[in-house]
């Protein structure tokens, strides 16, 4: 589920070729109606849902003084409200899967960031959203863990994705490019490995927090 159907189609083709089954859902999770419809479409296709990975996000950096408040709104909509909408929509199915599904456990993995653990100059609103994800994850974990829905947060350091490319040129030049030039960053497969580890533990084990960093990153 994402707003990039071309990439979803390519990924689905890889999954199909590997013998799996994939469903492509073109949805904007900042629209609650679309988020709820996407979850429902998934349930109808597969007959249920036992794992949710909230990975959508936006990182727009820069000072608070003179900031473009539309950038704040976009980050709050994607990083916070979108995560809330998909989680709320999926929870009934996850609780049902934990009670009666073949695994007898269900999983929510929220992708946060090191910026949800440590605050830096220029990361203020992005960190606000990611600290919020961390707090929400732990609170929800306490709410549903005894019903065998495991809720965990995965906090990556620097990863080679397009996340930084949406920033203004001056932000990229001052904050992002120098970091990338001196750090051997993670690749998306490293984060996928972390997610897979979290959701494949035995039923009696829950990973509440997983912090994955490049070795070079201080």
Feature map (PLM): residue ranges:
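Active-site loop immediately N-terminal to the catalytic Tyr-X3-Lys motif
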Residues: 65, 118-124, 183
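C-terminal helical subdomain
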Residues: 153-154, 161, 173-218
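Active-site helix of classical SDR
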Residues: 87, 129
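Substrate-binding pocket helix/loop in short-chain dehydrogenase/reductase
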Residues: 63-64, 68-73
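Active-site-adjacent segment of SDR/Rossmann-fold oxidoreductases
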Residues: 118, 139-149
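Residue(s) in the substrate-gating loop at a strand-loop-helix junction
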Residues: 113
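The beta1-alpha1 cofactor-binding region of Rossmann-like NAD(H)/NADP(H)-dependent oxidoreductases
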Residues: 5-6, 27-38, 69
């Amino acid at each position: 589920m994402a707003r990039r159907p071309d990439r979803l189609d390519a990924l689905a083709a890889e999954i199909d070729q590997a013998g799996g089954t994939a469903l492509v859902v073109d949805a904007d999770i900042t629209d609650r109606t679309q988020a709820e419809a996407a979850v429902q479409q998934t349930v109808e296709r597969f007959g249920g849902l036992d794992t949710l990975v909230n990975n959508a996000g936006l990182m727009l950096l820069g000072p608070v003084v003179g900031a473009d408040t539309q950038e704040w709104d976009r980050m709050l909509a994607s990083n916070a409200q979108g995560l809330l909408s998909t989680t709320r929509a999926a929870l009934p199915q996850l609780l049902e899967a934990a009670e009666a599904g073949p695994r007898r456990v269900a999983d929510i993995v929220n992708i946060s960031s090191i910026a949800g653990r440590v605050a830096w100059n220029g990361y203020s609103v992005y960190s606000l959203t990611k600290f919020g994800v961390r707090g929400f994850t732990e609170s929800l974990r306490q709410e549903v863990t005894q019903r065998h829905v495991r809720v965990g947060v995965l906090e990556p350091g620097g990863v080679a994705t397009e996340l930084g490319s949406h920033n203004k040129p001056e932000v990229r030049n001052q904050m992002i490019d120098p970091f990338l030039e001196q750090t051997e960053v993670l690749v998306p497969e490293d984060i996928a490995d972390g997610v897979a580890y979290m959701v494949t533990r035995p039923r009696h084990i829950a990973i509440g927090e997983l912090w994955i960093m490049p070795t070079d990153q201080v």
